[in-house]
Design a protein with these regions (language model features):
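Iron-associated oxidoreductase/ferritin-like identity signal
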Residues: 2, 19, 111-112
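Conserved small/polar residues in nucleotide/adenosyl-binding loops
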Residues: 159-161
Length: 161
């Protein structure tokens, strides 16, 4: 019984240790990477794989989730009081909607990827920026149009660009 309790304690410790808190200073990329060195490695890997600039990856994460790994869109209100449905299925650092996230997992052969992991989220953002560059011919260095395509989707972006 004591061994069982120790095992449970160790499991809880590792599970809670894996949960990532929001960085103290989300306005400064150097401070973020100083606090979370692995995030720099993950962002750099996404840059090397997809060509998506690191500052653009961080800007997307900041705008979409403010570095909150559990971020979800706010619920709509029924009769202006009762919490109701969420307007979309977006979740995690990247706030990717379910359909696009599933497409990413299929195309990158990453069946275990989750948007609650920073590594997977910045890889997704890199993939999305790369695909936007190929589909809509938007430069990877054009943050305004890249974010517009990220926010609106590839189909709706054609109307505004």
């Amino acid at each position: 019984m004591i061994l069982f309790k120790k095992i449970i304690f160790v499991l809880i410790f590792f599970i809670l240790g894996a949960c990532s808190s929001i960085p103290k200073n989300t306005q400064n990329s150097c401070a973020i990477f100083e606090e979370r060195y692995l995030w720099y490695k993950h962002s750099k890997a996404s840059y090397e794989k997809w060509g998506a600039p690191i500052h653009l990856q961080l800007a997307f994460v900041k705008k979409e989730s403010d570095f909150n790994w559990l971020a979800k869109p706010p619920r709509t209100k029924l009769f202006k009081v009762i919490p109701f449905k969420r307007p979309s299925s977006s979740f995690g650092y990247s706030q990717a909607v379910k359909g696009t996230w599933e497409q990413y997992k299929r195309e990158t052969n990453s069946p275990l990827a989750t948007s609650a992991r920073f590594k997977d989220s910045v890889d997704f953002i890199g993939w999305y920026i790369h695909k936007t560059n190929k589909i809509l011919r938007i430069s990877k260095k054009d943050p305004y149009r890249q974010y517009l395509a990220y926010y609106k989707g590839w189909g709706l972006s054609l109307i505004h660009i």
